[in-house]
């Protein structure tokens, strides 16, 4: 019995070079995943603090943060649950701008991001500086919705998205690494999607 006509099965779709190993393109969707109930945070009461190993601990209220130099990120994001979303557009302020005001001490090597809910995640200082991380309040030209971390979330797009803490209120600089919520529960300390660092030992 003859097999299928040549070309009937079509060509295998080439993998997008922007897609890390083990990920799939979620398209226009943006799945909602949280470690805790979604809080209701008013912009009028929100603030962001940089403290810990810094010369000048500093807090910015909503209006004060919006007066800082605007910064944007246009690119891709990747979730540890294997979805990736291409061509996102976020706006807010660069973490570099916040740290320039607070002035990290020479012995600061790590950062713990804390959410309004108490959720925490740890990051090496080098992964949130040098134009690699932002505190954002806009998505796709409008306010960031609460289910996606609004009014304000951390954005560290080169790492798996659990590192981009939703409803962020504090960045604490530290001399030593201190695991956050998911890291204490078996997730990788760094979370590089290109190295598939999903869990401890990966």
Predicted regions and their residues:
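Structured, non-membrane catalytic/scaffold regions adjacent to prosthetic-group chemistry
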Residues: 2-202
């Amino acid at each position: 019995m003859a097999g299928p006509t040549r070309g009937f099965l079509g060509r295998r779709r080439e993998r997008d070079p922007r897609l890390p190993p083990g990920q799939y393109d979620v398209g226009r969707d943006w799945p909602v995943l949280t470690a805790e109930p979604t809080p209701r945070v008013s912009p009028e009461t929100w603030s962001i603090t940089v403290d810990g190993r810094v010369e000048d601990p500093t807090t910015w209220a909503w209006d004060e943060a919006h007066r800082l130099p605007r910064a944007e990120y246009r690119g891709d994001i990747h979730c540890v649950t294997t979805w990736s979303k291409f061509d996102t557009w976020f706006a807010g302020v660069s973490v570099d701008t916040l740290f320039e005001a607070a002035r990290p001490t020479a012995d600061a090597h790590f950062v713990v991001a804390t959410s309004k809910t108490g959720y925490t995640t740890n990051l090496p200082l080098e992964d949130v500086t040098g134009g690699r991380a932002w505190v954002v309040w806009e998505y796709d030209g409008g306010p960031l919705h609460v289910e996606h971390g609004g009014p304000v979330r951390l954005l560290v797009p080169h790492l798996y998205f659990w590192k981009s803490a939703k409803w962020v209120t504090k960045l604490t600089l530290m001399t030593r690494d201190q695991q956050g919520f998911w890291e204490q529960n078996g997730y990788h300390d760094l979370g590089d999607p290109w190295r598939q660092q999903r869990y401890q030992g990966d």
